[in-house]
A protein has these predicted regions:
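Catalytic cores of carbohydrate-active enzymes
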Residues: 391-392, 446, 453-456, 497-611, ...
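Conserved oxyanion/phosphate-binding beta-strand-loop segments in alpha/beta enzyme cores
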Residues: 302-347, 376, 380, 464, ...
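Non-catalytic C-terminal accessory modules of carbohydrate-active enzymes
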Residues: 115-139, 146-150, 447, 585-595, ...
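A short, charged helix-loop
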Residues: 466-484
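Solvent-exposed loop and edge beta-strand segments that line ligand/cofactor-binding
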Residues: 259-264, 340-357, 397-410, 478-494, ...
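Terminal accessory carbohydrate-recognition/targeting modules of carbohydrate-active enzymes
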Residues: 1-314, 348, 355-356, 366, ...
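Aromatic-rich carbohydrate-recognition surfaces in CAZymes
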Residues: 172, 197-200, 268, 274, ...
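Extended, well-ordered alpha-helical scaffold segments
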Residues: 183, 289-310, 318-322, 369-383, ...
Length: 707
């Protein structure tokens, strides 16, 4: 029997109901209490996330054990927002208590191990057996109770720094205690977060004493740990074969070795509440000791500003959770000496992708009134524009490099730019540089640019070849392109038409009548061709893609996919009212699930109902039936537009997003996943925190509120 108990939303919304007494974390959205060890052990699939505005993060599970290679108490960004290094994997805590009855050794941490011969999962040490409560909010907090002794561990990341603090309080030592010592043993890999460490080929770790602590160096990276309340004792050791079940499920290498350089030892005094802080920082310099309180205050002020912009969109618990969730993805990025902004596509493994950034920007930045960051994000990608293309993504390791293999990122850039100007009324930035960047995109698409992106004679955009993957359905593995969508893709041309009409209106407003007339002419041509090429009279939905073979013969892919929903959801649609309604009906009947839209209907012969297995198997399912939560935004907006924003349409749109809100405030621990299985019960998968999933929920809630 699962003996974990989650508090209800009404309980959580009242800080007085905090587990174990009051809490100062007003952003707390989740709390669990446990009756025994099984309750905690059953929650190894519940993951929490902390971020700090730089691309650094901390991530782990409710019981405290790591189940992925990407988990750690500090995964720092060596070259923000990328270059992620696992600086501190875990901390093992132990209290030795000497009383008149003898010595008692109490373990609090835990790791997972897997017996290959029997398949048995073992927790060592079994610290999770003492876990009484867990809280998730701006910080994460575990509370352990053993024989009247209470140890509380709280983790916080330092705002805009590559550092963290792990704070402990210990109370309740036996009155006949002769001697009690807290031992804290850091477990370290100091490796790229995509890789794994093996003792056999790890190379040497250098352990060097510093004031109040230790500096550990491995190859080109270092981490410094300090603790004013204790002394560090060097005693190097290794823990072997830590097991990562989530890697095992993905059919990846699933074991790792941890280096332990020694331990901090802190003398405890009976009858007192003892507080101990361990500061962790990437590099050879210790974390500033004053940063814990100042960073907490700065982050709180920052979050309150965001919350004020969205607090009327739903109830208090939901808007608090959305405030923190939305903020997790907005980070700094340095471009040409300027501190600009960008959006991390997803945690733990994604960096900032152009497509994801500009789909997510309206929800994460405009709905939340973060107009300065929105402007800096548009600038970051405009600065790297090449041939009218914004980057598909920045390189993870070379800060000066960018990759441009996308046909839709630039059109989403235009979409985000138009929305930014509309909502911020920032005329000066449009006239200074943004308007020109937007027009550069449209002109490049019209005249032709890289990756065979060009406007055809019919006014529609064609792109790519059989060997390229330029749309968001871009999965390929071992030379297999799973969703070939070269030629004229339906959502690309819906975005193209919307961009032409919207930009024509903007440039006309600012005195560029000739350019406005030209874009309007292109839009009219595209509209006529779109209706002729994409409307499928037989099925009463839109064709997904049309392309020419090497002999010039046209091929039509009439597969029902969610891409067509953009032709019904964007502000400027090339379709009439009846066809927009028909699209909504087809998508609702065949693709809609509680957690988003399927990428294929279940009756399609290429449908994959489970997103699982090896990389090849997962890539094969990625856009072949897998559900994407972000698509709930375009779907619900199409519902609103098809229903003329009526009361019934608003109710239907809100009903569509309710399951995701429950996921956010329930099993998602304040986040929304990248994908879900196409088949019920629609298990979540991919990244546990995805920017556009959160962003589209926020954008939709405001659309409904303003309707």
């Amino acid at each position: 029997m699962n003996t974990a108990h989650a508090q209800t939303p009404s309980q959580l919304s009242n800080p007085a109901n905090a587990v174990g007494g009051g809490t100062s974390d007003v952003w707390r959205t989740h709390a669990f209490t446990f009756d025994d060890a099984h309750g905690a052990a059953d929650l190894t699939d519940r993951e929490w996330l902390l971020t700090n505005g730089t691309g650094a993060y901390a991530m782990g599970t409710v019981p405290g054990c790591n189940t992925r290679r990407y988990h750690g108490l500090l995964v720092a960004a060596a070259t923000p927002p990328v270059g992620r290094i696992v600086a501190l994997n875990q901390m093992l805590e132990r209290i030795d208590v000497d009383t008149s009855a003898g010595r008692k050794r109490i373990e609090f941490g835990t790791c997972m191990f897997h017996a290959a011969d029997t398949g048995q999962v073992v927790f060592v040490p079994a610290g999770h057996a003492h876990l009484q409560s867990f809280e998730n909010g701006l910080n994460v907090r575990w509370r352990y109770v053993v024989d009247g002794i209470t140890l509380t561990r709280q983790l916080m990341l330092h705002w805009k720094r590559q550092s963290a603090t792990i704070g402990y309080t210990i109370v309740g030592l036996p009155t006949d205690t002769i001697r009690a010592v807290l031992h804290l043993s850091p477990m370290i890999t100091l490796r790229d977060f995509h890789s794994l460490l093996s003792h056999s080929n790890a190379g040497a770790f250098d352990v060097r004493a510093v004031a109040d602590g230790v500096c550990v160096t491995h190859e080109d990276d270092a981490v410094t740990l300090t603790c004013e309340q204790g002394a560090f004792e060097t005693e190097s050791d290794w823990w072997y074969d830590i097991w990562y079940p989530r890697e095992n499920e993905r059919e990846q290498e699933d074991g790792e070795d941890y280096f332990v350089p020694g331990r901090f030892s802190v003398a405890l005094t009976p009858g007192e509440c003892v507080a101990v802080d361990v500061h962790v920082a990437l590099g050879e310099l210790a974390a500033p000791r004053e940063s814990k309180e100042s960073d907490c205050s700065a982050r709180n002020r920052h979050l309150h500003m965001i919350h004020r912009a969205i607090e009327t969109l739903d109830d208090e618990l939901i808007t608090r959770a959305l405030t923190v969730a939305a903020d997790n993805f907005v980070v700094d990025r340095s471009i040409a000496g300027q501190t600009l902004s960008t959006i991390i596509a997803g945690y733990p493994w994604f960096a900032d992708w152009g497509r994801d950034t500009f789909i997510a920007l309206p929800g994460l930045m405009l709905v939340t009134h973060r107009f300065d960051e929105a402007k800096r994000t548009l600038r970051a990608f405009a600065e790297r524009m090449r041939g009218g293309l914004v980057p598909n993504r920045f390189d993870d390791y070379d800060d000066s490099a960018a990759h441009f293999n996308t046909v839709d990122a630039s059109l989403w850039f235009v979409n985000a730019a138009m929305r930014y100007v509309q909502e911020s009324n920032d005329v000066s930035v449009w006239q200074d540089w943004l308007g020109q960047a937007v027009c550069d995109v449209l002109d490049a698409y019209e005249c032709g640019t890289d990756f065979a992106i060009h406007m055809d004679d019919d006014g529609l955009i064609a792109a790519g070849s059989p060997d390229t993957q330029l749309t968001w359905m871009d999965a390929a593995c071992d030379g297999v392109v799973f969703t070939p969508r070269y030629g004229k893709a339906v959502e690309i041309n819906a975005l193209w038409y919307d961009a032409l009409v919207g930009v024509a209106e903007l440039v006309a407003r600012y005195g560029e009548g000739e350019r406005a007339a030209h874009y309007t002419s292109l839009a009219n041509r595209a509209k006529r061709s779109f209706r002729q090429l994409f409307w499928n009279k037989k099925h009463q939905w839109l064709n997904d893609c049309v392309w020419l073979d090497e002999r010039g013969h046209a091929h039509v892919d009439a597969t029902l996919r969610p891409n067509q929903i953009l032709a019904a959801s964007l502000p400027h649609s090339p379709l009439g009212e009846s066809r927009r309604k028909a699209i909504v009906d087809a998508v609702r009947e065949h693709l809609l699930t509680p957690y988003g839209l399927r990428t294929l209907p279940p009756n399609d012969c290429n449908y994959h109902g489970r997103y699982e297995g090896s990389i090849f198997e997962r890539d094969g399912a990625y856009h072949q039936g897998t559900v994407w939560p972000w698509l709930i935004g375009p779907y619900a907006e199409a519902v609103l537009r098809a229903g003329a924003f009526s009361k019934k349409a608003r109710r239907t749109a809100h009903e569509a997003v309710v399951p995701l809100l429950k996921q956010l405030c329930g099993d998602g621990l304040g986040q929304l996943h990248e994908v879900h299985d196409g088949d019920p019960p629609h298990h979540p998968g991919g990244c546990m925190a995805q920017a556009w999933s959160v962003a589209e929920v926020l954008r939709l809630l405001r659309l409904i509120a303003q309707a």
